[in-house]
């Protein structure tokens, strides 16, 4: 394992017992439970028929895969060149860019009112494709940076585990929705509450585990890179899906799927490939990248929700326009004795004493 042009080994060591402490194990267990609960809840919003439709007409899935494995690795490679990163820094960022979509994309797609069926199909297809695409992309883009064979470092077992975590609870949720739909509201509400509580626990344990070690990667160029990478994914994923004329719901879904990477796989590759004295504090770069993913994703959700409140629905706009047009046309019609030409002029009728109105006038 050799990286070109590394000026000197990092004077850096991980916290004592890192990865084997009680807090580390507790964090891992809570993360798995939270992911299972999230996937179960998301499965309750899906339908087999709609999943089948996306598989039979995979236009959205193909666009998403092109965005995931075309845009993100290229963005990571170009950002490394633009900011003149060292080779070890560029390699750490490239590994993140070549990773498949993560589970956070499913949760944020729900918040963005995207197509949940497409989101789960995309996450599954992205993970399956990563078994072949990840080694290929790392081989192509790491030329001249890394002398070793990165394809042997791809955590195939981790990818398969992530697929199981997605598919099994989602399938249970779909079956519950079709067979026991009255349970779905309770699962969704309970899932949201428990997920929020677990998120608080995850945040607290992460701070305890990492401590101030993450401060070592908060250099200006790494901060800029880790902020621009997810932004590039969100933006280019939306633009690419718009070019292929997908509906707004699918555009938002592909945007989220492209911008969110599987950070756990990035950390695994860095941990397996490089010893601490080589990778140094860049071991924590995936965590910094995840922070920017979450922050930018939440900002996009806030902007989208505000836009929804300001802009009236299209149907309501049409109804208002038609009503206003009718009111403007009514006075002119009444002057001619008709309204829209459907009501004939009023004919003289008999008065109570048997005389018509003309005779009464005489």
From Swiss-Prot:
Regulation of protein activity: The transport of bile acids is sodium-dependent.
Annotated compartments: Cell membrane
Topological domain ranges for the Extracellular compartment: 1-22, 84-86, 143-156, 218-219, 274-280
UniProt KW keywords: Cell membrane, Glycoprotein, Ion transport, Lipid transport, Membrane, Phosphoprotein, Sodium, Sodium transport, Symport, Transmembrane, Transmembrane helix, Transport
Glycosylation sites: 5, 11
Catalytic activity line of the entry: taurocholate(out) + 2 Na(+)(out) = taurocholate(in) + 2 Na(+)(in); taurochenodeoxycholate(out) + 2 Na(+)(out) = taurochenodeoxycholate(in) + 2 Na(+)(in); tauroursodeoxycholate(out) + 2 Na(+)(out) = tauroursodeoxycholate(in) + 2 Na(+)(in); glycocholate(out) + 2 Na(+)(out) = glycocholate(in) + 2 Na(+)(in)
Region described as Disordered: 333-362
Tissue occurrence: Highly expressed in liver and low expression in kidney.
Entry function: As a major transporter of conjugated bile salts from plasma into the hepatocyte, it plays a key role in the enterohepatic circulation of bile salts necessary for the solubilization and absorption of dietary fat and fat-soluble vitamins. It is strictly dependent on the extracellular presence of sodium. It exhibits broad substrate specificity and transports various bile acids, such as taurocholate, cholate, as well as non-bile acid organic compounds, such as estrone sulfate.
GO MF, one annotated term: bile acid:sodium symporter activity
Biological classification of the source: Eukaryota, Metazoa, Chordata, Craniata, Vertebrata
Protein origin, superkingdom: Eukaryota
Ranges that cross the membrane: 23-44, 48-83, 87-112, 116-142, 157-179, 184-217, 220-243, 248-273, 281-311
Bilayer topology annotation: Multi-pass membrane protein
Phosphothreonine: modified positions: 330
Family membership: Belongs to the bile acid:sodium symporter (BASS) (TC 2.A.28) family.
Name of encoding gene: Slc10a1
Originating species: Rattus norvegicus (Rat)
InterPro entries: BilAc:Na_symport/Acr3, Bilac:Na_transpt, Na+/solute_symporter_sf
Cytoplasmic compartment spans: 45-47, 113-115, 180-183, 244-247, 312-362
Gene Ontology, cellular component aspect: basolateral plasma membrane; membrane; plasma membrane
The keyword Oxidoreductase appears for this protein: no
Identification of the protein by name: Hepatic sodium/bile acid cotransporter
Polar residues composition bias: residue spans: 353-362
GO biological process, one term: cellular response to xenobiotic stimulus
């Amino acid at each position: 394992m050799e990286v070109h042009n590394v000026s000197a080994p990092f004077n850096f060591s991980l916290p004592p017992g890192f990865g084997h402490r009680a807090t580390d194990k507790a964090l891992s267990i809570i993360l798995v439970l939270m992911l299972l609960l999230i996937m179960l809840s998301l499965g309750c919003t899906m339908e087999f028929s709609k999943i089948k439709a996306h598989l039979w007409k995979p236009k959205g899935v193909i666009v998403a895969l092109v965005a995931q494995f075309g845009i993100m690795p290229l963005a990571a490679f170009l950002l490394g060149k633009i900011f003149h990163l060292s080779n070890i820094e560029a390699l750490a960022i490239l590994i993140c860019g070549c990773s498949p979509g993560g589970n956070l994309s499913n949760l944020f797609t729900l918040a963005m009112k995207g197509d949940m069926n497409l989101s789960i199909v995309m996450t599954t297809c992205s993970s399956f494709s990563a078994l072949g695409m990840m080694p290929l992309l790392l081989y192509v883009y790491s030329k001249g940076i890394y002398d070793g064979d990165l394809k042997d470092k791809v955590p195939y077992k981790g990818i398969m585990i992530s697929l199981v975590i997605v598919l099994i609870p989602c399938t249970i949720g779909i079956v519950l929705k079709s067979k026991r739909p009255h349970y779905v509201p309770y699962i969704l509400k309970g899932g949201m509450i428990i997920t929020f509580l677990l998120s608080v626990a995850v945040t607290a344990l992460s701070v305890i585990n990492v401590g101030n070690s993450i401060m070592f990667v908060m250099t200006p160029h790494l901060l800029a890179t880790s902020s621009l990478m997810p932004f590039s994914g969100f933006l280019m994923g939306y633009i690419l899906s718009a070019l292929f004329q997908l509906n707004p719901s699918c555009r938002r879904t592909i945007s989220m799927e492209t911008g969110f990477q599987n950070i756990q796989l990035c950390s695994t590759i860095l941990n397996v490939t490089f010893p601490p004295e080589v990778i140094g504090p860049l071991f924590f770069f995936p965590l910094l990248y995840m922070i920017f993913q979450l922050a930018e994703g939440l900002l996009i959700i806030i902007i989208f929700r505000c836009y929804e409140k300001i802009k009236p629905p299209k149907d309501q706009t049409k109804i208002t326009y038609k009503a206003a047009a009718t009111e403007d046309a009514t006075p002119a019609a009444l002057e001619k004795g008709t309204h829209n030409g459907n009501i004939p002029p009023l004919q003289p009728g008999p008065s109570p004493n048997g005389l018509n109105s003309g005779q009464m006038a005489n």
